[in-house]
Regions:
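CoA-thioester-processing core
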Residues: 108, 112-114, 122, 128-164
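Structured loop/turn residues at beta-strand edges in well-structured enzyme cores
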Residues: 20, 66-68, 85, 114, ...
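Glycine- (often His-adjacent) and acidic-residue-rich active-site loop
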Residues: 29-42, 46, 75-108, 158
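An acidic, glycine-rich surface segment that forms the CoA-thioester-binding/catalytic face
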Residues: 49-64, 87-124
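Conserved CoA-thioester-binding segment of acyl-CoA-metabolizing enzymes
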Residues: 1-74, 110
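Hydrophobic/aromatic residues within transmembrane alpha-helices
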Residues: 55, 73, 86, 134-135
Length: 164
């Protein structure tokens, strides 16, 4: 994927590129949901409302591009595909915002799941919590050997998986 010229989406939390009929969407955020400016092998690629907005925009962009036949979704770096929602973001917002945030995440992942183009999730590291829910919205999931853990750890806290 080094031949790709990524373009940052508006909030700079998702990068987008196309090559030979494939749209590549890369999640790129730190533990607080802030944008990454370079490859960070330890970044958890957490998501916030801004990241979900960028992901939604990228999905729509790929869907309406007649030259794109397939979408590949991956994470920045090699430690995490995505660790799910930013805990610091969730701790700092109102219950009403959390409700609408989860609703928007549901709508975004439904759009990803229902897009008529083939969606492949390239799991390049841990895919946990909402990160796994993003991966589950793809048609095909493939992980590199020893990529990391896959799971929904929030169930140990009595919380249901809520965005996928």
């Amino acid at each position: 994927m080094s031949d790709l010229n990524f373009e940052a989406m508006p909030n700079k939390l998702v990068n987008y590129a196309t090559l030979d009929g494939i749209a590549v969407i890369e999640i790129a955020s730190d533990a607080n949901g802030a944008a990454l400016t370079e490859v960070n092998d330890r970044s958890p690629n957490t998501y916030t409302h801004g990241m979900m907005s960028d992901l939604d925009d990228a999905i729509i962009r790929a869907r309406f591009d007649d030259d794109v036949a397939c979408i590949v979704l991956t994470g920045n770096g090699s430690s995490f595909f995505s660790a799910g929602a930013s805990i610091s973001m969730l701790n700092s917002v109102s219950p009403g915002f959390k409700y609408n945030f989860c609703l928007h995440a549901n709508e975004t992942l439904s759009r990803l799941e229902q897009t008529p183009k083939l969606v492949v999730c390239a799991i390049n590291g841990h895919a946990v919590g909402g990160g796994l829910e993003i991966a589950m919205a793809a048609d095909i999931r493939i992980a590199r050997k020893n990529a990391g853990k896959v799971g929904l750890p929030e169930i140990n806290l009595g919380v249901l998986a809520g965005t996928g």
